[in-house]
Regions:
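Conserved catalytic-core segment of nucleotide-activated headgroup transferases in glycan assembly
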Residues: 1-83
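Extracellular/periplasmic ectodomains of large secreted or surface enzymes and adhesion receptors
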Residues: 1-12, 158, 162, 192, ...
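A structural motif in glycosyltransferase catalytic domains
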Residues: 30-34, 150, 190
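Conserved beta-propeller blade repeats
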Residues: 84-88
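Catalytic binding pocket for nucleotide-activated donors in carbohydrate/polymer assembly enzymes
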Residues: 89-90, 94, 98-183
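C-terminal alpha-helical cap of glycosyltransferases
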Residues: 182-200
Length: 200
């Protein structure tokens, strides 16, 4: 799937955050945190890239919960597609991972499409998969350990248009040159770490 040559902020004039994660991961803490990010970047938008995003009930609920958190519901956008969704990542500048249960496949998809993902790392496996993906893609700095750092990292990335443009152009090649995109290398590292833990 082709990546757009520039992130959408270049043509739209505002940063678009977004998610393609499963709605069951949209906890109260998750929505709270996303709302803080949107308030920290006042001209930004947030897009839901999900099959459910075409349903009027989903749209109404999403707008309501953000409005309750002092975010103008007009800033919330929806792309309701099933199946051929990868091209629509071209409408997203930065993916905001769900929390505490993070993405896995969706994080890889976003990175493949040149969209950096900010994630919050927790103690359990469901809270660390994106951390593994980002670290093995060469972007460990986007995996943070507090909500405050999550917001600060997202806001700083939104303000750095040069980096957004660079990542849009280079992320796919970064994946190919890092363990996440090199199966044999990843497996070697994984088994070496497993052996280290088993011998500890």
């Amino acid at each position: 799937v082709p990546i757009a040559p520039e992130p959408p902020v270049v043509r739209k004039g505002h940063v678009t955050f977004g998610t393609a994660n499963n709605p069951y991961k949209f906890t109260t803490a998750c929505i709270d945190t996303w709302a803080v990010v949107l308030r920290a970047v006042p001209d930004s938008r947030f897009v839901f890239l999900r099959p459910e995003a075409g349903a009027q009930g989903f749209i109404a609920n999403a707008r309501r919960v953000f409005e309750q958190r002092d975010v103008d519901p007009a800033r919330i956008e929806f792309i309701g597609v099933r199946g051929a969704h990868l091209p629509h990542y071209n409408e997203m500048d930065i993916a905001l991972d769900s929390l505490p249960h993070v993405g896995g496949t969706t994080t890889c998809e976003a990175l493949w499409m040149g969209v950096p993902t900010v994630t919050l790392v927790g103690p359990g496996f469901p809270e660390r998969l994106s951390y593994s993906n980002l670290t093995n893609a060469g972007l460990p700095e986007l995996a943070v350990h507090s909500v405050e750092d999550y917001v600060a990292t997202a806001a700083a990335l939104a303000a750095d248009r040069a980096r957004l443009r660079q990542l849009r152009r280079e992320l796919r090649s970064m994946l190919r040159s890092n363990p996440l995109g090199q199966v044999e290398r990843f497996v070697r590292h994984f088994y070496a770490k497993a052996a280290e833990v088993a011998g500890a």
